[in-house]
Amino acid sequence: MSSSFSSSCFDVEVTEKVAHIRLNRPDDLNSMVREFWTELPEIVRGLDAQGDVRAIVVSSTGRHFCAGMDLGVFTSGDTAITPGDSHEMGRVRARLRQTALMLQESFTAFERVRMPVLVAIQGGCIGGAVDM
């Protein structure tokens, strides 16, 4: 039996008890945008909860595996650091810490699953992609 679904950053397919998670933003070198960091742990935890998946393989589409983090993660949304924040450095640092913890939690999802996770890398693997 086979099942599949897609998100803004990933295509996921489960075939013969193997889940294949593909980074699918080749035009942007599969860079890790804000959605990447929320979608990845949700996908991994969901596969773990299914109970029938025995292994996860992570790969990508395009010439390169991943160009690393899109630095826009630090300049948009709740974690944005703006020039007006300079007088409140404590708050800036607290937001930065929360962002770093959220980013780390995304990769920690791989450690918490009950099955092995393999990563197939082709082309460039830069920055945060090396940590994955």
Which ranges hold each PLM region?
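Glycine-rich beta-to-alpha active-site loop
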Residues: M102-M132
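Histidine-centered beta-alpha loop that forms part of the nucleotide-sugar donor binding/catalytic region
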Residues: N24, M69, Q122
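Glycine- (often His-adjacent) and acidic-residue-rich active-site loop
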Residues: S60-E105
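Conserved CoA-thioester-binding segment of acyl-CoA-metabolizing enzymes
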Residues: M1-T61
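Short, glycine/charged-enriched secondary-structure capping and boundary segments
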Residues: E35-F36, D70-T75, M132
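Nucleotide phosphate-binding site architecture
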Residues: N30, G72, G127
